UniProtKB/Swiss-Prot annotation:
One of its GO terms (cellular component) is cytosol. The lineage of its organism: Bacteria, Bacillati, Actinomycetota, Actinomycetes, Mycobacteriales. The keyword NAD applies. Keywords: Carbohydrate metabolism, Magnesium, Metal-binding, NAD, NADP, Oxidoreductase. Residues 264-276 have a biased composition (Basic and acidic residues). Residues 1-22, 264-292 are annotated as: Disordered. This is dTDP-4-dehydrorhamnose reductase. Pathway: Carbohydrate biosynthesis; dTDP-L-rhamnose biosynthesis. The record marks T132 as: Could provide a fine-tuning to achieve optimal pKa matching between active site and substrate. It comes from Mycolicibacterium smegmatis (strain ATCC 700084 / mc(2)155) (Mycobacterium smegmatis). Binds 1 Mg(2+) ion per monomer. Involved in the biosynthesis of the dTDP-L-rhamnose which is a component of the critical linker, D-N-acetylglucosamine-L-rhamnose disaccharide, which connects the galactan region of arabinogalactan to peptidoglycan via a phosphodiester linkage. Catalyzes the reduction of dTDP-6-deoxy-L-lyxo-4-hexulose to yield dTDP-L-rhamnose. One of its GO terms (molecular function) is metal ion binding.
Amino acid sequence: MDLINGMGTSPGYWRTPREPGNDHRRARLDVMAQRIVITGAGGMVGRVLADQAAAKGHTVLALTSSQCDITDEDAVRRFVANGDVVINCAAYTQVDKAEDEPERAHAVNAVGPGNLAKACAAVDAGLIHISTDYVFGAVDRDTPYEVDDETGPVNIYGRTKLAGEQAVLAAKPDAYVVRTAWVYRGGDGSDFVATMRRLAAGDGAIDVVADQVGSPTYTGDLVGALLQIVDGGVEPGILHAANAGVASRFDQARATFEAVGADPERVRPCGSDRHPRPAPRPSYTVLSSQRSAQAGLTPLRDWREALQDAVAAVVGATTDGPLPSTP
């Protein structure tokens, strides 16, 4: 297995580069070992994905956003050139800041994925693009969203991610668009579970919104779904990959306190108006995996079980030293 860091590489970065003009590229993701290009590999999902893909025997080129700016068409074509499959983890994820930087958010979340899709189509490489539950939310509902339900983002971040989905599928109809939600690792980063762990270690009560409901998703489980797609047997198109069940942020916070042995009664419910933000948040974006399962993607386990394992993994890792921070 090879894990190749993109830093300092040139167009000849593969350990076993393909000869110019060969015809062995594969858009179908049904072979055991693949050459995987990961964009946005410096982020929470990208880091775990790079490690797990290499552990499964794939040759991996892990590119941070500074090493491959997906808004740069030339850079994208250069790095995609010899890959069997590209997994796009690069995104503008600062939901509130996107309200003040809509052009930048659109460039990264819509133009960039379109560039990747066009480059992959040109060389017959597979493409897996990660999207979000925030493409939904404008409709008042309380039942999980299926892949073909009407979209309706309520903020600029969600609108740019929806535009990215459309750009990907327009340029490469056989791409995989994988929507996920409320992703966390729980270590030393700034995700919701990591934040709740830090607050649980302190004293006093905290107020957490109970009127935002979604699908908390553990990074490790999401990565498993992405690698299942690489392994083959999943139909292309839009898929949902989120841990099963329904949770509010309040529910997720209480469960995190319980998992670390803190008193969950310290977590108190409140409304979103208690914590006003520049970008509106959707009240309900639970993702259903039913159609995705029919397409061949194994549904992810219940969010509470995943959260317990995530916290246990963090505790085990910190016994020997802290986890790397995740931006």
